[in-house]
Amino acid sequence: MRKARWVRLIVLFLGGYGLNLHCSLAGQTLSPTHIDDFTGRPRVIVISDIGNEPDDQMSFVRLLLYSNEFDIEGMIAATSTWQKTATHPETMHALIQAYGQVRANLLLHAKGWPSADDLSALVFTGQPAYGLAATGADRMSPGAEAILRAGDREDSRPLWICIWGGANTLAEALLHLRLTRQPDAVEKFVEKLRVYSISDQDDAGWWIRREFPQLFYIVEPSTQVGDEYYYATWTGISGDVFYRNGAGADTKTVTNQWLDENVRNQGALGKMYPRFAFIMEGDTPSFLGLIDNGLDSYRRPDWGGWGGRYIYRQPHGESRSIWTQGGDLSSRITSQDTVTGTDGKQYTSDQATIWRWREAFQNDFAARMSWTVRDYAHANHNPELEVNGQPGTAPIVIEAEVGKPVLLDAGRSHDPDGQKLSYHWFQYIEAGAADANHAVVTITGSDGPIATATPTAACRPRWLPAPAPCVGTGTAHLILAVTDDGSPQLTSYRRIILNVHAASSPENH
């Protein structure tokens, strides 16, 4: 009798759970179908509360080292909850002057480095006051004007706004836009923008998201005083010890000792890289994913890459869906990655979506810093990949069928320094739209230049029975990581997306 009663209770529980899960998924805004597909370098504007503590200056040094990867259209000194009444564009100018001393050496290694004069001309200031109170119809800072000029340019590429401090300069620009232009012109302007904000560091971010619901916005909403930063994905850059949220992560490349040995002792720009007070470079994830390394996560935040992985959902307290964290663990619709840690155990967290790549992006940083003082022959450079006859870094999309092997050939990849290459093919299980079916793939030859990927199912099984059955089509994101044996070891990537269809019936053959 007791056993029968418990069985009925379990059935009722699961039935109610399934109903709740169904309602939860039905009410969730589906991920946007748009994928940013453009040629050329990403357009970037940075808004920074530089001067309040070391980490903005650290991130700014890295930004300059990768300035050949972007079209920088503005660097705006702003306020934040940590610096409410002053901005410090002079710090940006000082760092750019140091960059100018090493630019000639950087040009020995790659093309596209802007001149120091050109960069200095792109430094602006926002209002030297805090938050929304500093905006209004009669106010227009040079920083807000720079945002409007950039957004008005005839350019099909999206414009990334990387917010390292308060968001009131962007709010100022958008308010002016609304007050001076027709609604269709405002909509056209806003559609160009891609915002990645390092939490909410003033009261402007929530206002922007509410007033401009069509605006692309990456953020984990937070209070303005920093008590919720520990939860944010961006802390995966280096916050393991300070925030106590990085179990499994390897901390050796984000210590002051490692930075002394690999960054601060490397020429004029390295000397400008301060010791961190709390964590290293908390703002860097906002542009780290824009680097053209083959992961291409800037095309869709749910693809995942050096800047983390996010899903499209409506967090509690927000007026609409944004690119953010969280999700439904029971159905595996979540922003978290499961990664093997340094101890061989598996760890699941939002921060892991960044720290899983840490050794690679820190080695990349160290190599670039060495470019500021070494000639080409005495420095290391990234492997150049070719997969199935396709060179470059753009993602490769392949139509596949369950049970039919897909050949992946990277044998023509090479290293510009003639070094030995090691290969690692793997399925990035969590990558892709949260509301899509994720296919299951088996990879053979995963540690060589030629691998075979065989889809075994169009849909990954869920932990609980899915309220909507698999319709026979799913996607799988495969990553090729190729690492050289130089010093430091450098890694390049290629993303292969398999559109997996159910096996054809015999009568169709």
Regions found by a protein language model. Name each.
Residues R8-S24:
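Bacterial N-terminal signal peptides
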Residues Q28-L407, S413-A439:
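N-terminal acidic, glycine/proline-rich low-complexity segments
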Residues F426-P465:
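Surface-exposed, flexible coil segments in extracellular/virion-facing regions
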Residues V482-Q489:
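Short, solvent-exposed loop/turn segments at the edges of extracellular beta-sandwich modules
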